[in-house]
Amino acid sequence: MYKSLFFCLKIFAVLILVGCGITAYIIYHYSRDLPDYSQLARYYPPSVTRIYSHDGKLMEEYAFERRVFVPINSIPSSLIESFIAAEDKNFYNHPGVDLLGIVRAAFLNISNYLHHRRMEGASTITQQVVKNFLLTNEVSLERKIKEAILSYMISRVFTKEQILELYLNQTFFGRGAYGVAAAAQNYFNKSVEELTIAESAFIAALPKAPSELNPERNYARVKARRDYVIARMFEDGYITKDAAKEAMDSPIVLRKRAKEETVTADYYAAQVREEVIRMLNSKEEFYTGGLTIITSLDAKMQQLAENSLRKGLREFDRRRGFRKPIANIPLDNWQEEIKKLPSPPSLLEYKLAVVLDVADNHAEIGLIDGSKSKILIAEMKWARSNLKSVKTLLKKGDVIVVEPIKDGYALRQIPEVNGAIMVMNPNTGQVLASVGGYDFSTSKFDRVTQALRQPGSLSKTFVYLAALENGIKPNQIFNDGPIEISQGPGMPSWRPKNYEGKFLGEITMRTGLEKSCNLITVRVATAVGLTKIVDIIKRFGINNEPKKVYSMVLGSIETTLSRMTNAYAIIANGGKKVEPHFVELIKDRNGKIIYRRDNRECLSCNVSDSNLDIAILEIPKEDIYRVTDEASDYQITSFLTGAIDRSTGYAAKKLGKIIGGKTGTSNDSKDTWFVGFTPKIVVGSYVGYDTPKELGKRATGSNVVLPIFIDFMSNAYKDEPSLPFKVPDSIKLIAVDRATGKITPSGTVIEAFKVNNIQMLENEDMIDNRDNNDIFDYVPSKEDQSQEIY
């Protein structure tokens, strides 16, 4: 008997030795090519870069993975306990691998298999860290062995808190959220400190199947999984029975960010993204660096600018009439038929509807949700001139675009025309608002910064400014009559025309700009010389390489809305150089400043000089200097306020503010512009087709774009006081006769003269251009008089 027992013991000992040997060999074999886990000590997870408006509203988030890193000491114990209960009951006691858990899971899975239930895993939190950071998701014995070895090794080097920090910041929770902080924001719009027990349990339940556990699709399953975690928390002694019951009884309510915490500014955010990537010279750093970017954007102005642009584009498009229905469908099963149609691009707040019946004075419509309503003929009058009956416009089965209004719906259509608007502070260069098109989701092409278009009469301002810089007085008389300019050997002569084909005779230079006279502008250009006009266009940043041709003075050069708005901002601020900028400040993931635009205090950025003991990106600062002298600048400003008071911008006078501005219309009315300004704000807007074509025979900056400016200013600037432009000491204001330019006590206009020209104020003859061999007067034919140039 003893011999048998001794023999059995020897066999058992041999088996143990063999087992230990095999285990040692396995550990040795698989340990030879293990990944370096020391990298975990240098863990800097990819983090979300966030862009904010100047007043603190979230504009956009950019990331390859939406993750917000939060240190373990900032994660509440209730959230940690939720994960311990859900994922690894013995986390604080095992050495990385839970042998008891493996045995328990094995027996449990036998029962689960027999009863057709889901299999239970036995991976510890440490093993999940190893899988997420160091290994792949490959299902193999080799990976599991390496996972166990690494988990044991990591547990000897890292504390439990360090392992938890890695796990809670790396795990995927669905909805694009990586880490518990991102999950708390995405699902509940809360920080981790604000989560309730029920919300913590919900987040802890997600790692098992983050894509499937969606309460909006499968509420019962998600609640069951959450309640399981709550029950485990109670069983493990983390919460009381009453707390568990209260948590289980609470519904799962997902919350998005409150609307007042965010601002929609897609074009602006895209511009900021490109600008910061250029600054950093790294796309990777932008998308993974967890940057906080404070911009110049004013959230209120941005929303108003977007509203005004869309309103203006829609109103202009409606003036062109109704094009046609989107489709025509059978009415037998209209609700299903309309659902089959692809949603038109840029539908926005508009809706699709189908015409169910038509009467003379209204149309009955059905909407996708099955509801029915009416459109009265009054809401279709824009569609066709002298519309007498709806039956001549629509028929049964027509699919149309409608807009909800107070007492029903109105017929609408998505505009084909596009445009842009930009709002700047002329003194600082801050871009307060920028909308690059009707709808970013349809077209990401930014018409503020990317669209090169002809500015038309907007460029005339700088021809007159060049004249003022060179000593020509504002009351100088020029002849608004037909002219002919030689363009060189073998080239036909150029005969510019005024917009309406009329001639005003002898008028002052001021009147020439106020009335946007083409012929006066050309005569002023010949008096100054093209070389000086090319110089001023470059100086103001309108175009870096303008062609030295006379048509340039009437706006044949190409420029962008951003450049043109900035050029007028220089005029608005008294002639000092300014550049549009979008970015005020950038912080890294640790809150340290890596870029600040200048040394002015940014009260809303929570910045102090104590933050600045780090390497700051060297962003070259532009020297502040004058682009034009302040006297000439005030004179041209006076001209431009006159254009609002008496001419093409007159409609803006109803705003009741002192405003300078200029309209612009290119040849054939393909591009229309308006830039208006006060001492505190400059607003530029543009309307045109992306593929240039005529907007209409009588389409001008005055009737297409100026309404956008007026709508914006009436909302954004209505409570601001009307501020006068500062009169420099080098200017003397004198009353003159508007028609003749002569000084008179009862003058009809207050003119701005340079002090050093006071002694020459006796009105002189108009400038004699007869010495210029390239220009001469001519008598126009009837055909010439009928032609128009803008």
From Swiss-Prot:
GO terms for cellular component: outer membrane-bounded periplasmic space; plasma membrane. It catalyses: [GlcNAc-(1->4)-Mur2Ac(oyl-L-Ala-gamma-D-Glu-L-Lys-D-Ala-D-Ala)](n)-di-trans,octa-cis-undecaprenyl diphosphate + beta-D-GlcNAc-(1->4)-Mur2Ac(oyl-L-Ala-gamma-D-Glu-L-Lys-D-Ala-D-Ala)-di-trans,octa-cis-undecaprenyl diphosphate = [GlcNAc-(1->4)-Mur2Ac(oyl-L-Ala-gamma-D-Glu-L-Lys-D-Ala-D-Ala)](n+1)-di-trans,octa-cis-undecaprenyl diphosphate + di-trans,octa-cis-undecaprenyl diphosphate + H(+); Preferential cleavage: (Ac)2-L-Lys-D-Ala-|-D-Ala. Also transpeptidation of peptidyl-alanyl moieties that are N-acyl substituents of D-alanine. Its main location: membrane. InterPro entries: Beta-lactam/transpept-like, Glyco_trans_51, Glycosyltr_51/Transpeptidase, Lysozyme-like_dom_sf, PBP_transglycosylase, PCB_OB, PCN-bd_Tpept. It is found in: Cell inner membrane. Residues 1-6 are cytoplasmic. It is a single-pass type II membrane protein. The keyword Hydrolase applies. GO terms for molecular function: penicillin binding; peptidoglycan glycosyltransferase activity; serine-type D-Ala-D-Ala carboxypeptidase activity. GO terms for biological process: cell wall organization; peptidoglycan biosynthetic process; proteolysis; regulation of cell shape; response to antibiotic. Residues 49-220 are annotated as: Transglycosylase. Residues 398-711 are annotated as: Transpeptidase. Keywords: Antibiotic resistance, Carboxypeptidase, Cell inner membrane, Cell membrane, Cell shape, Cell wall biogenesis/degradation, Glycosyltransferase, Hydrolase, Membrane, Multifunctional enzyme, Peptidoglycan synthesis, Protease, Signal-anchor, Transferase, Transmembrane, Transmembrane helix. Pfam families: PCB_OB (PF17092), Transgly (PF00912), Transpeptidase (PF00905). The chain crosses the membrane at residues 7-27. Its EC number is 2.4.99.28, 3.4.16.4. Pathway: Cell wall biogenesis; peptidoglycan biosynthesis. Cell wall formation. Synthesis of cross-linked peptidoglycan from the lipid intermediates. The enzyme has a penicillin-insensitive transglycosylase N-terminal domain (formation of linear glycan strands) and a penicillin-sensitive transpeptidase C-terminal domain (cross-linking of the peptide subunits). In the N-terminal section; belongs to the glycosyltransferase 51 family. In the C-terminal section; belongs to the transpeptidase family. This is Penicillin-binding protein 1A.
